[in-house]
Amino acid sequence: SAPGGWSQVVSKELNGTGSIIAIDILDMPKIKDVKFIKSDLREFDQNKLNQPIDVVISDIAPNISGVRFIDDTNMIDLLEIELSIVDKTLVKGGNFLAKCFEGGSSEFLRKEINKRFKIMKRLKPDSSRKISKEIYLLGLNKN
């Protein structure tokens, strides 16, 4: 999907009542109420996020090699960066949504969400192909 899909949804939902920061390695079309930062998340200076954040949404995934162990390892590396952002900036009571792969990376993320949030949910959007290992895990109400 094109960069900015989640940002469009959140912008429409907030309708000007909040601020949105989007970070993507690819260019993204201008979206109302969205501050866009073009960066590879692995190289991003998290100090630029110098404000409390209510919700972190991540739709990031590594390039797929087709080798499950490598793909899971690469996904976990990205999830660790996302969790670092959650730990540094997400407010108490905040929420976190992240893409992962069913299996190794989802088990890792499940454990990490359970440590940090009161509620954890597994989501598979209707738009996701049935054979796809891609799922989302949602952490609600950060401790």
Report residues per predicted region.
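Short, ordered loop/turn segments at secondary-structure junctions
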Residues: S1, I25-L26, L41, A61, ...
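Conserved SAM-binding loop of SAM-dependent methyltransferases across substrates and taxa
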Residues: A2-N15
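S-adenosyl-L-methionine
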Residues: S19, I23-S65
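Conserved helix-to-beta-strand junction in the class I
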Residues: E13-L14, I85-K92, K99, R116
